[in-house]
Amino acid sequence: MGTIKSGDIEKGTFLLFKGMPHIVLEREFSKMGRGGSIVRLKLKNLKNKSVVKETLKGADTVEEIEVLEVASQYLYRENENLIFMDLETYDQFDVNLREISNIEDKVMFLQEAGIYSLVKWDNEVIDLRLPPKVAFEVVDAEIAVKGDTVTNAMKNVTLHTGLVVKAPLFINVGDKILVNSETKEYAERVKE
């Protein structure tokens, strides 16, 4: 663990703030006249899921926590637990959905046998890193109305994990599409 100046904090940085692990969700830097600079942070507590806003002076320092990223294969879901396998040791372990603060919105992106990066701190999983874009198969799509293309027309499509996203009218059942894992929006059709 080391200290980091508030001006060097970036989105996605892991910090030990008030004795608890946090991840930086948003960061805004403001330069004041003679008053120096300030950094506004939106932090998510990785233990109790609370989101707090903090303002730090430019010269302030906070403790950055060292995390370990472990490549793991997602195997299956069992009630409130996600079962993973460590790709180095081949040990299976479970991750409780209630113990990780920001995992609920990522579960729909998990696909069996997919490789994901689990972030560990103090020998405990605190985050799950998804790739920027994830490929899905479309299992249900609304019927497109011909001629309804005056604007950027979109329709709802259901993906094989149950996730529903808006996609262009030309997307049909059986197509594979890429979805942005951060915005949960259609990115592009997979070219085969």
From Swiss-Prot:
InterPro entries: Elong-fact-P_C, NA-bd_OB-fold, Rib_uL2_dom2, Transl_elong_fac_P/YeiP, Transl_elong_KOW-like, Transl_elong_P/YeiP_cen, Transl_elongation_fac_P, Translation_prot_SH3-like_sf. Keywords: Cytoplasm, Elongation factor, Protein biosynthesis. Gene3D superfamilies: 2.30.30.30, Nucleic acid-binding proteins. GO terms for biological process: peptide biosynthetic process. It holds the Pfam family Elong-fact-P_C. One of its GO terms (molecular function) is translation elongation factor activity. Pathway: Protein biosynthesis; polypeptide chain elongation. It comes from the Bacteria. One of its GO terms (cellular component) is cytoplasm. It is found in: Cytoplasm. PANTHER family: ELONGATION FACTOR P, ELONGATION FACTOR P (EF-P) FAMILY PROTEIN. NCBIfam families: efp (TIGR00038), PRK00529.1 (NF001810). HAMAP family: EF_P. Involved in peptide bond synthesis. Stimulates efficient translation and peptide-bond synthesis on native or reconstituted 70S ribosomes in vitro. Probably functions indirectly by altering the affinity of the ribosome for aminoacyl-tRNA, thus increasing their reactivity as acceptors for peptidyl transferase. Belongs to the elongation factor P family. This is Elongation factor P. It comes from Borrelia turicatae (strain 91E135). The lineage of its organism: Bacteria, Pseudomonadati, Spirochaetota, Spirochaetia, Spirochaetales.
